[in-house]
């Protein structure tokens, strides 16, 4: 799944909701990879000398393709949900994730898109994945708000389950 993202224009706001805390990143400010509470850092992997920050839904967004530029982070405690804003410039050449989460045992769940723009829920264990259609298609060059709600075992797209 090429580092959980591919052909993504940007992620404006990534939220990790734990039982008692919420971590948010806006990409604005002096250190755009530092969470709003100043305690968590996104790890940025890129072959570019300077990461490309672009205009997002609100504020800045990181332009990434999931292959040459992507991000990850480690969280403490249980995570109940992930959310983020994404916009595709093109569809990936293979199924790729907008965002996902993996536990210490190697079990993962991710919201993905295929090469035709169909959204999928990807579930895997140690690199072996299976996908279930979310029965919706993503338009290119339009912002999409994605919420992966682990507590309620659901995915919300632009506020709709």
Model-derived segments and spans:
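Positively charged n-region of N-terminal signal peptides that target proteins for export
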Residues: 1-5
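Bacterial N-terminal signal peptides
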Residues: 7-15
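Sec/Tat signal peptide C-region and signal peptidase I cleavage site
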Residues: 17-21
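Extracellular glycan-recognition modules
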Residues: 24-43, 64-121
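Extracellular glycan-recognition surfaces and repeat-rich motifs
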Residues: 37-59
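Short, aromatic/His-centered strand-loop micro-motif at the edge of beta-sheets
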Residues: 123-144
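Short tryptophan-centered beta-strand motifs in secreted/extracellular beta-sheet-rich domains
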Residues: 142-151, 155
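Short, solvent-exposed beta-strand-to-loop segments that form ligand-recognition rims
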Residues: 158-161
């Amino acid at each position: 799944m090429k580092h959980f993202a591919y052909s993504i224009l940007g992620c404006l706001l990534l939220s990790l909701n734990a039982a008692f805390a919420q971590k948010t990143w806006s990409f604005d400010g002096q250190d755009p990879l530092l969470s709003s509470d100043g305690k968590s850092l996104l790890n940025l992997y890129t072959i570019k000398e300077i990461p490309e920050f672009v205009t997002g839904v609100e504020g800045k967004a990181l332009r990434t393709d999931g292959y040459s530029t992507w991000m990850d982070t480690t969280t403490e405690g249980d995570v109940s949900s992930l959310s983020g804003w994404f916009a595709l410039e093109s569809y990936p050449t293979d199924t790729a994730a907008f965002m996902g989460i993996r536990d210490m045992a190697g079990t993962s769940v991710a919201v993905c898109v295929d090469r035709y723009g169909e959204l999928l829920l990807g579930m895997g264990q140690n690199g072996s994945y299976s996908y279930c259609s979310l029965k919706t298609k993503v338009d290119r060059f339009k912002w999409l708000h994605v919420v992966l709600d682990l507590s309620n075992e659901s995915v919300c797209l632009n506020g709709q389950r």
